[in-house]
Amino acid sequence: MDINDDLNINSPVDNKNVVIVRARKTNTFFKAFKVAPNIWVAPERYYGEPLDIAEEYKLDGGIYDSNFLSQDSERENFLQAIITLLKRINNTISGKQLLSLISTAIPFPYGYVGGGYSSPNIFTFGKTPKSNKKLNSLVTSTIPFPFGGYRETNYIESQNNKNFYASNIVIFGPGSNIVENNVICYKKNDAENGMGTMAEILFQPLLTYKYNKFYIDPAMELTKCLIKSLYFLYGIKPSDDLVVPYRLRTELDNKQFSQLNIIDLLISGGVDLEFINTNPYWFTNSYFSNSIKMFEKYKNIYETEIEGNNAIGNDIKLRLKQKFQNSVQDIWNLNLNYFSKEFNSIIPDRFSNALKHFYRKQYYTMDYGDNYNINGFVNGQINTKLPLSDKNTNIISKPEKVVNLVNANNISLMKSNIYGDGLKGTTEDFYSTYKIPYNEEYEYRFNDSDNFPLNNISIEEVDSIPEIIDINPYKDNSDDLLFTQITSTTEEVITHTALPVNYLQAQIITNENFTLSSDFSKVVSSKDKSLVYSFLDNLMSYLETIKNDGPIDTDKKYYLWLKEVFKNYSFDINLTQEIDSSCGINEVVIWFGKALNILNTSNSFVEEYQNSGPISLISKKDNLSEPNIEIDDIPDSLLGLSFKDLNNKLYEIYSKNRVYFRKIYFNFLDQWWTEYYSQYFELICMAKQSILAQESVVKQIIQNKFTDLSKASIPPDTLKLIKETTEKTFIDLSNESQISMNRVDNFLNKASICVFVEDIYPKFISYMEKYINNINIKTREFIQRCTNINDNEKSILINSYTFKTIDFKFLNIQAIKNFFNSQVEQVMKEMLSPYQLLLFATRGPNSNIIEDISGKNTLIQYTESVELVYGVNGESLYLKSPNETVEFSNNFFTNGLTNNFTICFWLRFTGKDDDKTRLIGNKVNNCGWEIYFEDNGLVFEIIDSNGNQESVYLSNVINNNWYYISISVDRLKDQLLIFINDKNVANVSIEQILNIYSTNVISLVNKNNSIYVEELSVLDKPVASEEVIRNYFSYLDNSYIRDSSKSLLEYNKNYQLYNYVFPETSLYEVNDNNKSYLSLKNTDGINIPSVKFKLINIDESKGYVQKWDECIICVSDGTEKYLDISPENNRIQLVSSKDNAKKITVNTDLFRPDCITFSYNDKYFSLSLRDGDYNWMICNDNNKVPKGAHLWILKS
C-alpha cells in the first residue's frame, strides 16, 4: 500500500487523483485527493454540519470556529497532515494491513441475482449505465444481471454526474465542533444489514491534547476512526441503542449511569477493554450472532456466485476476496492496544472521549515536520513541547453541576464545576433489568490473543489488485443528511460540607500574589482570594522559616533556596504511611485525606480508613442488583433413559449450568467495575489533579523568585544559566509528581480490589446458594424418579451432578491484582524507562553500527577509526589511537541542580597513566562531571558552577582486566555512590555541590592509550547496591555458567554431577585394576554413595565460573582426589595430587545453556557406551557416542 504524497492544495484536477465531486444529497462541491486506492481526502469542513451554531446547542468542551479551514494555507496544512498520518500508519506492518483492508473492503454490490442474492429494489438503479468493458463482459455472461450488470455503492460523483470514482472512505475536516472526530455512514440500513456502505470521517489533525503527561498521538486518533469505518464497510454497525453501562455517576447521591456505545468500547483499548478480556462472558446480545450470520450469508454468495465467475472483473472479485478472508470477529478484535504497540505510542488508560469528566482538555497546535513525522513525535509524547492553541479561549464550558459551598449562614463561599463525561446518561439500573440468557446462542467471547487480527491480509496481493475504474453506480447509495442538535442544562446544588471538587478548586492559583495555607476554611473565606490551599507542610514550614531572611540576590543563594524547595516538595508529595487493613498492608501518601477532604477527617485519614475500611471511600454502599436468571428444568423426556445415556445428558446439563453460574459471577464482577471501581478511578483522577495543582503552585513560587532575582545585579550569562537550571528543575518536579501519582494509583487500586473480595464476592456466593440449593433438590428429585436405573446408579448420578461448594470458586484474585499491577507498571513507557542512553554496538556487513537503543534518540558521532572488538559479553568500543572520540548528544544529559543520574559501563584499560588523562565526561566551562585517569587509577570528579568540587580516586582498575563501573548521583540524599563490579567502593556526601548544568554532550575520549568500553548507559535515577549487583550478574548472564537450579556456578562449592542422558543417576567412584575411575551407578540393590564434585579456581580472584574458564576438578567421598585422564583407555581417573590433575576447560552448550561441557585439548568428556556394568566417564572424540552424552549437569 503506497500513500500518494505528491499532492498539494493546488494540484490540478485530473479526474483521477484530484477531482471535483458533489457532496451526497446536496449541491455542494468539494475538491478531493486520492491518497490511496479507495481512500480520499477532502481538505474542507464537513458539509453535513452547519458551521454557525446557536449557543444553546454548543457542547461542553467543544470549540466552534466557522472560519477554521477557510484559508488555502490551512487546507494545505490539513492535507499534508493527513498524508503524514497515513504514512505513519502505513509505516508499520499492522498499519499497512489496516489500510489495505480499508482499501479492499468494498460494500457488497447491489443487483446480483445469479445465485439467490437480489437487489432490495432493482428499479432504483437509475439510468442504464454507460457501455464499458466490464459491463460488456457481464452482458455476455450466462448469469442474469438486471440491466446487464450489478451496481456499486462506494463512489463519489463528479459535479456533472458523468464521472464516478471508487471510494470506501473520504476524510474531511471537522464539522461544527472543530475538536470532535466522528465517522458517519453513507447509508444506515446497509451499514447494519451486512451489505456495507462507505464512510465519511470527520477529523482534526492540526490540534491535539494532553492526557496526564503525554500528548495524544493524532495517528492513534485517526486509526480509531479508520477501524470504525470498517464496521460500516462490513455492514456490522450495531444499533445506536446497543450501549453498556460505563460508570456510575454519584455526585451528591444522584444515581445515574453513563452509557458507552459498544463500538467505542471495542475500539478504544485501554483498561476498559483489557478488563473485558479478563471476563469472557461479559456481554451477551443477539448483535454478535446476527452479525456473524450476515457476514457468512454474503461470504457464501461471494464464494458460490462471484469468486469463480469470469464475467466479473478482478478489480471487484479480488477486493471481495480480501474482505471475506477477514471475519467480523477480526474486526471486533481490532483495537488501539495493538496499534499503540506497533506505533510505540502511549494511549489513554480509559475511554478517551469520557475523560473530559476527569481532565479538562487544553489543545496544542501540531507541528508536522519539526515536532512530528512518520515516526511520531520527534522527541516522544512526553518530552515534545507544543505551543498552546489560541483557540483554547473558545472552549465551551457547560458544567453538568455547579456545587455552591455555603457557610452556616448560607453565604456562598465558592462555586465549583462538575463536568459531564460526554456520554448519554440513564437512571435505569442496567443490572436489575438485564436477564442473563441461559441459551449460549447470543454469547460472544472476546479474543485475548496477542496475534494481530488482520494477519490474513496479504499486502502484496492487495497492491496487485487493479483499481476500480468503471463504476456502475447504484444511485440510492446514501441517506438524507441529518444533523441533530442537543441542548444541555446546568444544575446548581448547595452544600455545607466541602466536597473534593471544592478542595481541588481551592488549590488553583487565581491571584499572582498568593500565599499558601493549610487551613481550607480560611482559604475559601478570604476576600481577595490571595490564599491557596496546600498540604505541603514541610515546604510551607521552610518558606515560613526563611521569609525574614535577607534577599536572594546571588546565584549561590538562589541555588541553595531552590534545592531546599525541591527537596521539601519531593518529601511532602511522596512521603507514605503504611495502613494495616483486613486485606493486608497498603501504602498511602500521607497527604491523600487532606488534599480532597476524603472521609472529612483532616489529619486522621489513616485512622478512619482502618476503622471504616476501603468501602468508606466511595458513596455506593447499598446492595448489588441481583440479576434476573432462568435455568431450564430437566425435561421429563429423559426419565426413561439408560444409565449411560442419562449420564451423558446430565453431564451436558451440569456443564451448561456451571458455565451459566460463571456468567452470573462475571455479572457481579462487571457491577463492581462499573459502580464501584469507577468511583475509585474518579478518586485517582482527582488526586492526580491535586498533585498537578500543587506542582503548579510550587513552579509559580519558583518563577516568582526567579523574577525577583532577575532584577538583581547578576551578569546576563549567569542569569541565563539560572534560567536554564530552573527549567531543568521544573522537569524534576514533574518526575517527582509522577512518582506520587503512581503511588496513588497503587493505593486506590488495592482498595478497590479489597472491596470486591470482602463485599462483592461474598454477596455473589450468598446469592448463588439460594439457586444452587433449589437446583440440587430438583436434580435429586428428578434422578429418583428415573425408571431405567437402579438405586446404586441413582446414587452415583446424584453424587456426580449435584453442586458442591468447590464448584463455585470462581474468584481468581491474583488475576485481578495482576491486571491492576500491569496498569500501574505501564503508566508511560517513556517515563518508566530510566535509560537516557543504552549503547548498542555491532559489526555490520559494510560498516560498524553504534547506536542508542534507549528510545531517547541520542545522536552518536564517532571517529571513523574507532573499532569494535568482542569484549565481556558483546561488541565493545576499542579506542586505540590518540584523540579518538565518541560523542553522545541528547538534551537529557544537561544536568542541573536537582536531577539524579547514574553512569554505568564496562572498562578495560591496557595502558599506563601517571598524568591526568580524560576518559569520559559531561563538562564545559569547568562545570559538570568527568572521569579521568591519573596516577594509575581512575578519578570521578564533579564540580558545580560556583567552584564547589568533589573528587574520588579509584585504584586497582588499570591492570588489563575488565571492570564494571557504576557511578550514582542522588541529589535528594546528596549522596555519591561508586561501585566496581559488584562492590561499593565509595559513599561520599555531595551536599556542597549545587548546579552542574553543563552541556547536552557526553564525550568518550582516548588520548594516548588503548581503552575498551562496553555497555555504556546513562540513567535518570540513582542506583543502590542491589540493582548494581543484579545488573552486573545479569549482563554476565551469557558468560557465567549456572547449575541445574539456574544459580551461578560457584568455585569451591560441592555439587553432584549427572549426565544429560541419565539426569537422575549420579556418578560414583569405581576401583578397577588398582585405579580409581568414575562411572554411573548401574548396580541395583547396592547402596553406593555418590561422590561430590568441586571446581577449583586457578584464578583466585574469581568466585564464579565463566565460559572457557580453566579449572581443576576435585572429587571427594571423604578423601579429596582430582581429575586426570588415563593414557591407557581415555577414562577419567582420580589422582591424589592436585599437581598431577588436568586443567579442564568448562563451557556451556549452545543449544542447551543449562548443560555444561568439560574438555581437554579440544576433546570432550562424555559417558562411554555400556561396558559390562559401567558407563565410564571418558575423554575422547568418538562420534559414536550420543550427543547428549557429552553434556553434564551440576546439582547443588
From Swiss-Prot:
| One of the protein's GO biological processes | proteolysis
The record's listing under SUPFAM superfamilies reads: Clostridium neurotoxins, 'coiled-coil' domain, Concanavalin A-like lectins/glucanases, Metalloproteases ('zincins'), catalytic domain
Q: Which UniProt keywords apply?
A: Disulfide bond, Secreted, Virulence
Tell me the segments the record calls region C-heavy chain nHC.
829-1195
Cystines in this chain:
C583-C754
Cellular component, GO annotation: extracellular region
UniProt key word Phosphoprotein: no
Q: Which domain of life is it from?
A: Viruses
**Major localization class:** secreted
Q: Which residues lie within the region annotated N-heavy chain nHN?
A: 409-828
Q: Which InterPro entries match?
A: Bot/tetX_LC, Clostridium_toxin_transloc, ConA-like_dom_sf, Nontoxic_nonhemagglutn_C, Toxin_rcpt-bd_N
Region (Light chain nLC) residue ranges read: 1-408
Claim: rRNA processing is one of the keywords in the record: no
Name a Pfam family for this protein. Answer: NTNH_C
- Where found in the cell? Secreted
The terms under GO molecular function for this entry are: metalloendopeptidase activity; zinc ion binding
Q: What does this protein do?
A: Assembles with botulinum neurotoxin type D (BoNT/D) and protects it against pH-mediated inactivation or protease activity at pH 2.6 (the pH of the animal gastrointestinal tract) but not at pH 6.0. The non-toxic component is necessary to maintain toxicity.
Return the similarity comment: Belongs to the botulism non-toxic nonhemagglutinin family.
What's the entry's take on its domains? Has 3 domains that are structurally very similar to those in BoNT/D; light chain (nLC, equivalent to the light chain), N-heavy chain (nHN) and C-heavy chain (nHC).
Q: Which NCBIfam families match?
A: botu_NTNH
What does the annotation say about its assembly with partners? Forms a highly interlocked heterodimer with botulinum neurotoxin type C at pH 6.0 but not at pH 7.5. Botulinum toxins are produced as progenitor toxins of large molecular sizes of 12S (M toxin) and 16S (L toxin). M toxin consists of a non-toxic, non-hemagglutinin component (NTNHA) and the neurotoxin. L toxin consists of the M toxin and the 3 subcomponents of hemagglutinin (HA). HA is composed of subcomponents of 70, 33, and 17 kDa. Erythrocyte agglutination occurs when the entire complex is assembled.
Further facts: This protein can also be encoded on a prophage.
Protein's UniProt name = Non-toxic nonhemagglutinin type D
- Lineage in the entry? Viruses, Duplodnaviria, Heunggongvirae, Uroviricota, Caudoviricetes
